[in-house]
Amino acid sequence: MPIPEPMLSTRAATWPAHGDWMMEPKWDGFRLLAAIDQRGRVRAWSRRGASLGDRLGSLLEPLAAAPRGTVFDTELVALSSCDGRVIQDFATVCRATLQGDAAVAPKLHLVAFDVLELAGEDVRPLPWVKRAELLRESFPIGDRLRLVHTQPASRTAHEKLVALGFEGSVLKRPGSSYRPGRQTTWRKYKATHRATATLCAVRPGRDGDTYALCDLGGRRVTTPGSARLGALIGQQVELAYSRVDADGSLREVRISRTGLEPRDLA
């Protein structure tokens, strides 16, 4: 079974002024294409074609109940508990997929949000709303297999998703077909949180890039940086990030502002 090229969302900064959109929470994990071939074997690939099925433990086994010749588009996520809340754990996803750590496989979950082929039929040309219906009918929901939640798009609903710990939302046109590559009929809106930290050092990394080391309330935070930041060591900077991971690390963190004045710190 050939590996389909996934459809990708386009990042947007402004909310759509008009039009009919549906919304899904933006999970923070690894994109995974899961396929059931004509022999009933279940296989899984990353969006770049790396085979990952042997690193996921028993997670994919229930998918064998789906019709043969079916391909699901999913997000591989890990969930942890903190202070009674269930939170996403991207670091654990990396340990499973990149390092092959079998011990963390039981923490993995699969969230399905689209179906590309169903019982040998290519359903990508169908509108999203029809594919969503087929997905609900064909995806075998289980303890660690779930369907993405969909609802009409609104700013209020987006803000509620961010408050729940999601890194944002994905908006989709109900009539959109599934096309490979980045498309404007799928738009992602990421949350941006901000915090003030002290710039402690600027150092080159092993990859040749420059990184800034910051202190955020006694916690060490490393962000992409540049040599010019060396003149600002000891000063306050503003950090921007999308969410806090289960281990307390900041996802997609960067220095968004320097030269803060006392009024900025009040």
Residue positions per predicted region:
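Catalytic cores of nucleic-acid ligases and guanylyltransferases
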Residues: M1-A266
